[in-house]
Design a protein with these regions (language model features):
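A detector of single, family-specific signature residues
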Residues: 1-285
Length: 285
C-alpha cells in the first residue's frame, strides 16, 4: 500500500506524519531536525513511500539533499501555496501542519519548487554576504553624513577612497565629535576591506565560469549581475522556455479577472528579489 509523509520542520524538532492512500494516519512522531533521525523514522518499517513533502525554508535544502541521496521521493513545496492549503485548519500546530502536508502529498495538492544545487547555494551565500557588508558600510557612511550635518559639517561629494579623510578633516577642530566618529570610521574601514575580499572571490569565480563570461558580453551586465543570474537560474533545463524565466523572477504582470472585471496589474514580484534588483540596475546602467 502506498504511503505519504508530511514533515513540518523547525530548528530543533521536526514533526513527522505518515498516512496511507485512504488518508488514515499511520504514525505521528517528533524527532530531532537531523537527516539521520528523520531517515530512521522513515525507514524503520518497510513502507512503500510514494511522496515525502516538506516546506521550502532555511533548512529544507539541507534535509532535501540528504533524503534525496538516500533514494527517498522527497518534494519541496512552495511556501505560499502550502500556507494557503493549511490556512483552513482551525488549530495550528506542528502536528497538524505535518498532517496537512501529508494529506497534500496524498491528493497531489502541492506545487513543487526547485532545490538549488550545492554549487549555486555557495554562490548565493557569497553574493548575499557581499551585499550585507556593502549595505552596512553604506549605512555607516550615510549615518556619518546625517549626524555631522546637525553640527553644520557637510561632507559633500566625496568618493569611497577619500571618505575617511574627509570626515577626519571635518572633525579636526571638534575633539569630542572626533572621539565619537573614530569607532565608526574603524568599523567602516574593516567592512570595506572585507567587502573587497569577498568581491575578489566573486571575480575569481566569474573569471573561470564560461556562462558568466558569456553573460557579461551583454551591455550593462557585470560580474555581480552575471553570477547572480547564474546562481538563481541554477539548472536551465527546469524552465520549459525562456519566457518562464521572467515569470519565475516575478517580472510578469498579474491578472485579476472575475465576471465582467478583467484587470492587468503590475508585475507579480514573486521569486528572487535580489535577482530583480540586479536586472533593474543592469537595465539602467
Amino acid at each position: 500500500m502506498q504511503h505519504y509523509v508530511g514533515l513540518d520542520i523547525s530548528v530543533k524538532e521536526t514533526s513527522v506524519c505518515i498516512v496511507d492512500k485512504a488518508g488514515k494516519v499511520i504514525r505521528e512522531v517528533k524527532v530531532a531536525t537531523e537527516p539521520v533521525a528523520i531517515l530512521a523514522v522513515l525507514t524503520e518499517e518497510p513502507l512503500a513511500l510514494e511522496r515525502i513533502g516538506l516546506e521550502a525554508g532555511p533548512l529544507s535544502q539541507w534535509l532535501y539533499s540528504a533524503l534525496a541521496e538516500a533514494g527517498l521521493p522527497v518534494i519541496c513545496v512552495e511556501t505560499r501555496h502550502m500556507k494557503a492549503a493549511l490556512s483552513a485548519q482551525i488549530n495550528k500546530s506542528d502536528r497538524n501542519d505535518a498532517r496537512g502536508i501529508a494529506q497534500m502529498m496524498r491528493v497531489g495538492l502541492y506545487r513543487p519548487v526547485h532545490v538549488k544545487t550545492l554549487a549555486s547555494q555557495k554562490r548565493r551565500m557569497l553574493l548575499t554576504s557581499r551585499q550585507l557588508l556593502q549595505a552596512k558600510a553604506l549605512d555607516i557612511e550615510n549615518d556619518l553624513r546625517g549626524t555631522l550635518r546637525n553640527f553644520g559639517l557637510k561632507v559633500g561629494m566625496v568618493g569611497t577612497v577619500k571618505f575617511e579623510a574627509r570626515i577626519r578633516e571635518l572633525v579636526a577642530d571638534h575633539p569630542d565629535l572626533a572621539a565619537i566618529v573614530e569607532p565608526l570610521l574603524i568599523a567602516r574601514r574593516v567592512l570595506r576591506e572585507q567587502l573587497g575580499v569577498l568581491h575578489r572571490q566573486l571575480l575569481e569565480i566569474v573569471r573561470h565560469d564560461e556562462v558568466c563570461r558569456r553573460l557579461m558580453t551583454t551591455p550593462g551586465v557585470g560580474p555581480v549581475v552575471a553570477l547572480t543570474f547564474r546562481a538563481t537560474v541554477d539548472v536551465p533545463s527546469r524552465f520549459s522556455n525562456s519566457k518562464a524565466v521572467g515569470a519565475a523572477f516575478g517580472l510578469t504582470t498579474c491578472r485579476q479577472q472575475s465576471g465582467e472585471i478583467d484587470r492587468m496589474g503590475g508585475i507579480s514580484k514573486c521569486g528572487d528579489a535580489m535577482m530583480r534588483e540586479m536586472l533593474f540596475e543592469a537595465a539602467w546602467s
